[in-house]
Curated annotation (Swiss-Prot):
InterPro entries (UniProt xref): Ala_racemase, Ala_racemase/Decarboxylase_C, Ala_racemase_C, Ala_racemase_N, Ala_racemase_pyridoxalP-BS, PLP-binding_barrel
Pathway: Amino-acid biosynthesis; D-alanine biosynthesis; D-alanine from L-alanine: step 1/1
GO molecular-function terms, A-Z: alanine racemase activity; pyridoxal phosphate binding
Gene Ontology biological-process annotations: D-alanine biosynthetic process
Protein name according to UniProt: Alanine racemase
Active site: K34 (proton acceptor), Y249 (proton acceptor)
Gene symbol of the encoding locus: alr
Binding site for substrate: R133, M297
Cofactor(s) in the UniProt record: pyridoxal 5'-phosphate
Domain of life: Bacteria
Length: 355
């Protein structure tokens, strides 16, 4: 077991959810808990959000859906964003998972199993309005409009789409996607709709429709929501080095003075990127401490020379993620996004849930 601890504040996640629900007013708000709840624990987060009346949970795959269903029981809706495939259709039916159908082939597969089971099978349809990743194309949507038998045997519960650049509020592409979505929905007047991801919630009520699907904002990856995550690591080694001493693999850092160097037990095997070598920072008692030398598989070194001697000791905790170094701030150092920082949190870390 790692000496490092990831602390997840479920109360903060619940408060973020309630903030988003308040913004959405009359629309339902679900939760994206794919990738194990963005690395924070899909089961624990979902159970906490159920307490706030969340009933729609979005996962990527059938495997994620089965794990969540086993933990949550039948009283929630679990939606599988990657859709249905021949190999997992029966599993989706057995575990009451609802696929988001992304192309005509998936519709055909789901119809086939509807006939096999001789009953309606629930589904969402995903219309591609411009992200050009998953979703039915304009040609496929036109086929559905002109031939409703293509949906025979299916209980179509929602039509969804996904915004490509919702975090840029003034980007005109958001409105382009909204208008395309509305144009398609005219042909399905009795079907509920969902468009807003986290960023979409903040674009205004026109984007909310019947159901919003936040992920990032629940986990503090938005200026208006709070970070629920703290990652701490203890000092496990201390050494006094003289001027011109080399630190770590490839000797990429050389001391410019007599220095006190501390070692922390985490590295790239724990999802702490090697790109933080010689440019990241951690915090000890609110003071910034630089990472020096290469990030290695299991260890990083930090320069604690400028800390008061009373704060430099074995077992002293350094904050890697927290109030002083949020996932978004850390991500900006190495040119990535906070999502990647969270989903990369290693399995060796101890998880502690509070709130």
């Amino acid at each position: 077991m790692s000496l490092c601890t990831v602390e997840i504040n479920l109360s903060t996640i619940k408060n973020n959810y309630l903030l988003l629900q308040d913004i959405c007013k009359t629309s339902l708000v679900g939760a994206a808990v794919k990738a194990n709840g963005y690395g924070l624990g899909a089961v624990q987060i979902s159970k906490a959000l159920i307490e706030e009346n969340c009933r729609h949970f979005f996962v990527a795959s059938s495997e994620e859906g089965v794990n969540l269903r086993n933990a949550l029981g039948l009283d929630v809706n679990i939606l599988v964003l990657n859709g249905v495939f021949e190999h997992d259709a029966l599993e989706l039916i057995e575990y009451n998972l609802t696929p988001v159908l992304n192309n005509l082939k998936q519709i055909e597969i789901w119809q086939k199993f509807s006939n096999l089971k001789n009953r309606l099978l629930p589904c969402y349809l995903h219309f591609n309005t411009g992200i050009n990743r998953l979703g039915l194309s304009s040609d496929e949507i036109e086929q559905l409009i002109n031939d409703r038998d293509l949906l025979k045997g299916l209980d179509l519960q929602y039509i969804i789409s996904h915004l490509a650049i919702s975090e840029e509020i003034d980007n005109p592409y958001n409105l382009e996607q909204l208008n395309r979505f509305k144009a398609y929905l005219q042909y399905f007047p009795n079907v509920k709709a969902s468009l807003a991801n986290s960023g979409g919630i903040f674009l205004g009520q026109d984007y909310h429709f019947d159901l919003a699907r936040p992920g990032a904002a629940l986990y503090g990856l938005n200026p208006l929501t709070k970070n629920p995550v703290t990652l701490k690591a203890p000092i496990i080694h201390l050494q006094n080095l003289t001027l011109d001493s080399h630190i770590g693999y490839n000797m990429t850092f050389t001391t410019k003075r007599d220095s006190v160097i501390a070692t922390l037990p985490l590295g790239y095997a724990d999802g702490f990127s090697r790109n933080f070598s010689n440019q990241g920072e951690v915090f000890i008692n609110s003071r910034s401490v630089p990472i020096v030398g290469r990030v290695s598989m299991d260890l990083i070194n930090i320069d604690v020379t400028d800390l008061p001697p009373s704060e430099i000791f074995l077992g002293q905790e350094a904050e890697i993620i927290g109030n002083y170094c949020t996932p978004d701030k850390i991500a900006s150092i190495i040119g990535t996004i906070g999502y990647e920082v969270l989903t990369n949190l290693g399995s060796r870390y101890k998880r502690k849930y509070i709130g």
